[in-house]
Amino acid sequence: MPNNVTVQELVDKVRLKVLQGEDYLQRKITTSDISRPALEFAGYFKHYPAARIQLLGITETSFAKDLTHEQREEYMTKMCMPQTPCFVISTNLPIPKELKKAAEDAKIPILGTHLTSSQILSNMTSYLLERLAPRKSLHGVLVDISGVGVLITGDSGVGKSETALELVRRGHRLIADDRVEVYARDEQTLVGTAPQILKHLMEIRGIGIIDVSTLYGTGAIMPSDQISLIVHLETWTPDVQFDRLGDRGDTQTIQGVIVPKVSVPVKTGRNLAIIIESAAMNYRAETMGYDATETFDRNLNQLIKQNSERDSKNNKGSAN
């Protein structure tokens, strides 16, 4: 996973215009934080975040106009540091001539957009947060089952890829097979994708490598998906106790995000695709407020109470 993004990539993804410095678009962006210079236009550079993208909007350029030419020249030269990746000017504003010269001397590109500062700030931050997030590679298969991202894990040879292939055949979509790159979009959202070299591919023992998009169409694949549920496949053994009521509430923490987890015993004759499909549908029902285990417990307690009351009445009748 790269820990930087080039200015060229930012231009392409966020649709920025290159106003100046086309030869310098390979400069590296190493942080998703974006600076809107304010104190710098007052001459205070003690804590200047030079490694960030510098965003100038109506407020910043208007304030700069009230400065003298010498002040603008001094401050904008100081803002053009070797580690500064680029400047972005919003709302189709003109480039201050002092910045134009300082950026050219420092070989820093200046980009522009018709969007407001708030809009372009949001767009750039969202892209950079996703691109620069620390990533972890997991062994497993990621499938989207009716809108629920399910990460299937388990020992090698337990049948993860074969089960995922059956799920794809049933109309669900593959994101990654064998290796899943995951990153935390925020504290509650874990996203998975496939390494570039493995996109759309699956390895099936006895057959080899297959291209899912070629065999089943582009509707059978997705580039990435939120991981909402982990299904861990375990070889069944008599001495291992598995959850039969679904009230255990197991979870697994990945990249700081807590994800619900269910363990499914693998045994000859079990249709794992249908079981995992049901697990995903059950998870979706729970997120909508329905809990089958809770309903079962409530109905069972009601039945026990009714039987107890009936037995109590029968005992009283016998006594009379």
UniProtKB/Swiss-Prot annotation:
The keyword Thylakoid does not apply. It holds the Pfam family Hpr_kinase_N. It catalyses: [HPr protein]-L-serine + ATP = [HPr protein]-O-phospho-L-serine + ADP + H(+); [HPr protein]-O-phospho-L-serine + phosphate + H(+) = [HPr protein]-L-serine + diphosphate. It comes from the Bacteria. One of its GO terms (molecular function) is protein serine/threonine/tyrosine kinase activity. The keyword NAD does not apply. InterPro entries: HPr(Ser)_kin/Pase, Hpr_kin/Pase_C, Hpr_kin/Pase_Hpr_N, P-loop_NTPase, Ser_kin/Pase_Hpr-like_N_sf. ATP binds at G154, D155, S156, G157, V158, G159, K160, S161. Residues 265-270 are annotated as: Important for the catalytic mechanism of dephosphorylation. Residues 202-211 are annotated as: Important for the catalytic mechanism of both phosphorylation and dephosphorylation. Its cofactor is Mg(2+). Both phosphorylation and phosphorolysis are carried out by the same active site and suggest a common mechanism for both reactions. Homohexamer. The Walker A ATP-binding motif also binds Pi and PPi. Belongs to the HPrK/P family. This is HPr kinase/phosphorylase. It comes from Limosilactobacillus reuteri (strain DSM 20016) (Lactobacillus reuteri).
